[in-house]
From Swiss-Prot:
The lineage of its organism: Bacteria, Pseudomonadati, Pseudomonadota, Gammaproteobacteria, Enterobacterales. It comes from Escherichia coli (strain K12). Involved in sulfur transfer in the conversion of molybdopterin precursor Z to molybdopterin. The cross-link is not seen in all structures of the MoaE-MoaD complex. The keyword Nucleotide-binding applies. This is Molybdopterin synthase sulfur carrier subunit. Belongs to the MoaD family. The modification 1-thioglycine is found at G81. InterPro entries: Beta-grasp_dom_sf, MOCS2A, Mopterin_synth/thiamin_S_b, ThiS/MoaD-like.
Amino acid sequence: MIKVLFFAQVRELVGTDATEVAADFPTVEALRQHMAAQSDRWALALEDGKLLAAVNQTLVSFDHPLTDGDEVAFFPPVTGG
């Protein structure tokens, strides 16, 4: 299983802070695409190009490989003022 965490606006849009999915996705991008297909709100929350990802608490690119037991976090880019 892969544990998926959502933070900030992503969490608000998907309506949960975490979920678990089968370890059937070779990359972070494959997982993102699968989850974005669940509904319009999920698609908006996980929109390509407006999201960062971390695997096991390390910032990664979306072509990063996934394995069983990984923890993936999706969150919006941090902005400051």
